[in-house]
Amino acid sequence: MAAQKAGFNIHVPFVEHLGVRILQRGDGVVRLRLDPRPELENSWGSVHGGVLMTLLDVALASAGRSLDESCNGALTVEMKVNFIAAAQGAVLGEGRAQRAGRSLIFSEGELRSEDGTLLAKATGTFKLLYPSSGE
């Protein structure tokens, strides 16, 4: 499965459809990249805000998941996004796990253009999911 090979370790069809690539994942940090296609743009020719929110969701959740490889997913409990600039061209993202509880992860991250322009920032809380123990 494409996403598993790209570093997600789980199959997420929507993320695969977008073409998100994980560049680095481990120790609470995730770096990713999206090379947008025309169908991911808004009516002004910028990357759609929903796509940017998805990138941040993936980066923040994946950063948390990278702290515990036994978890098999993460659910978004809450996420706050600040949009700062329009995204034109490739988008680079970074997510960082800030604090890990027993089942919740608190993460932050940002998206930047290739020239380093800050596009968006986010914070979020995620519930880690684990395989059933069979009980």
What spans do the regions from the language model cover?
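Terminal targeting signals and extreme-terminal segments of soluble enzymes
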Residues: 1-135
